Amino acid sequence: MKKVLFLVVALASFAFGADGEQIKAFSVVAAGIGLGVAALGGAIGMGHTAAATILGTARNPGLGGKLLTTMFIALAMIEAQVIYALVIALIALYANPFLG
C-alpha cells in the first residue's frame, strides 16, 4: 500500500505539470485560508491574553505595571506569528516555488 501511495504522489507532479493556472488558483485559495486562520488564531490568543491581564490586575492591582509589560511582549509574539503567515502567503502568491 505504501508503494502505491508513493507512486501516486510521485506521479502527480507529471500529471499536473502543465497546469500553471490551476496552481495559481489554488495558491490564492491557500493564501486566503491560511492567512484567515492565522488571523483568527491570533485574535483569539490576543483576547485571552488581554482577559488574563485584566483579571490579574483586578486581583492584584500592585502588579498592574508588570502584567502590562508582560502582556505587550506576549501580544507582540502573537502578532509576529500572524506576520509570518502573511509573509508565507505573499511568497505563495508572488514568488510561488511550485510554478518553476
UniProtKB/Swiss-Prot annotation:
One of its GO terms (cellular component) is proton-transporting ATP synthase complex. NCBIfam families: ATP_synt_c, PRK08482.1. It comes from Campylobacter fetus subsp. fetus (strain 82-40). It is a multi-pass membrane protein. Pfam families: ATP-synt_C. The record marks 79 as: Reversibly protonated during proton transport. F(1)F(0) ATP synthase produces ATP from ADP in the presence of a proton or sodium gradient. F-type ATPases consist of two structural domains, F(1) containing the extramembraneous catalytic core and F(0) containing the membrane proton channel, linked together by a central stalk and a peripheral stalk. During catalysis, ATP synthesis in the catalytic domain of F(1) is coupled via a rotary mechanism of the central stalk subunits to proton translocation. The keyword Cell inner membrane applies. The chain crosses the membrane at residues 26-46, 71-91. This is ATP synthase subunit c.
